[in-house]
């Protein structure tokens, strides 16, 4: 629930549930998820990220301090991820070209060859990284990536600006009224 719903609402339910739950193992697991979700709330520092790009170079999130970083956790086998690439990525990049945004694509579900083939096939421009192993990968764990596509916006200060950011097609169809628009336009 912490991954998909408003954190404030789930925090209330979590507090009430803790009062009545008698299964300590379940409570420990829930506490772990709560702690991870809590760390990802807007204003908190984004977890350190160190991944390899398609050329084998190590890339860190901290390399982009002073810029917005729109992170797209995606998968080669993810239909909705591919749909976004095909239908929105170019319009999205064009619309926001004046906002100093780095587009970071982190592939979580495949090996290196399939990932590189997908980068070429979908002409992914931006920072392309791989976090093989998905739920087992430390970056995916730190960012609480439970499903894909999963989007986040990191602020210019390196802190989380939006923990559950909308996908590009939703932002484009909002006509400038999305949370994404409010955050980036508020920085100019």
Indicate residue ranges for each PLM-predicted region.
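Short, internal strand/loop/helix patches
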Residues: 50, 116-157
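Oxidative protein folding and maturation machinery
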Residues: 1-59
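Generic structural signal for well-ordered beta-strand positions
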Residues: 59-60, 161
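Thiol-/selenol-based redox modules, centered on thioredoxin-like
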Residues: 153-188
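Conserved redox-active cysteine motifs that mediate thiol-disulfide chemistry
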Residues: 65-66, 73-90
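Active-site acidic short loop of glycosyltransferases
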Residues: 65-67, 98, 124, 145
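Structural microenvironment flanking redox-active thiols in thiol-disulfide oxidoreductases
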Residues: 82-122, 134-141
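Alpha/beta-hydrolase fold active-site loops
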Residues: 68-69, 149
